Amino acid sequence: MRDVIVVGGGPVGILLAGLLAVRGLDVEVLERRAEPSRRSRAIGIHPPSMRALEELGLADAVVERAVRIRGGEVRCDGRALGRLTFREAAGQHPFVVSLPQYETEALLRARFDELSPGRYRSGVTVTDVRDRGDRVELEVEEAGTATVLEARYVVAADGARSVIRALAGIRGIKRGGGDTYLMSDYPAGEQAAEQAVLYFERGGVVESFPLPGGRRRWVAMTSSLQPDASSHDLAAIVESRTGVVLPSSGASVSAFSVQQRLAERLVSGRIVLVGDAAHQISPIGGQGMNLGWLDGLLLAPALALAIREPGTAASVLSDYDRRRRRSARMAARQAGFNMMMGRPATGLRLRLRNGLVRTLAVPPASAVLASAFTMRWL
């Protein structure tokens, strides 16, 4: 019987598994996918998340491979409304790290394999979960064979459509959303290599973030979900709103509709939720993966204590539930504000929005805003 089985081998699940392993726990990761994804997906690693990477000895390796985003600029109608620096808000790491998710996952998997060789299992599907009071049983299928695994605790890190959450009977409560976007990565062109740019334009927000290898991530709000859009369609939106002409690209485009949900509870007996299984947050603002990592930073020591001193389990896991649900609610409010600011605006609303941006971009408000955008409060 394992100490902990983590269901879901994405960036949140594998980071948590590493944090448990460095504490000496017997941990195993079950991942449904047979092969890792090669999509860039989440790219931003905020300063508080660097603490988790430091615990695993990965902070330097991540920073070496990444682009450091040291600040951002907000523009409208070809003019800068305000600039923001992360220098004062971010402490030891005065920047947001930009690295494609597949590279981050590869580093995490390699480190976990060093800590717990052979304990990352891919191509495994969970079909049932049963909390027996003193342990959890998982029914799984692997290569057509059904088996039962046991652990003292099971952690659901299996994403927004979490099978474990559903099997445990935990509801997800919707908290707004519905805005739609297109996203893709393009050759960088002439924009500053360490600066994010937000275009608060009349037709909706366009966002641009640097990536390693001379590329940039571009995101644009759309009036409806456009699942068949191409990179040329996104480039046309960017040019029409901002005047920026993107280089031709054959990269795939992601069309997504924002969903925000919070699980009614994060702990059910010996089953614990983390990441998108616990809270689904708008990706606008780059909070989702980081929020899950901060879950892991709190949950790893809590589970270690609960296993070694069982009498503390109810208290430490209740504290985890309370604190991380509170952080998720704060993140959802901030994500809602980010989306509201990026919606189409004309006339008085446009002038009021631009005025608010100018106000927030100067001290003392700028320091507060920088802390919020670098997730110092979560």
Please identify what each model-predicted range represents.
Residues 110, 153, 157-258:
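Conserved FAD-binding catalytic core of PHBH/FMO-like flavoproteins
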Residues 144-153:
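Core beta-strand elements of the Rossmann-like FAD/NAD(P) dinucleotide-binding domain
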Residues 8-18, 22, 108, 156, ...:
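Conserved mid-domain beta->alpha element of the FAD-binding
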Residues 21-41:
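Glycine-rich FAD pyrophosphate-binding loop
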Residues 122-136:
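A conserved short coil-to-beta-strand element within the FAD-binding core of flavoproteins
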Residues 223, 302-378:
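C-terminal helical "tail/cap" subdomain of flavin- and related membrane-associated enzymes
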Residues 1-4:
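Extreme N-terminal starter segment of soluble prokaryotic enzymes
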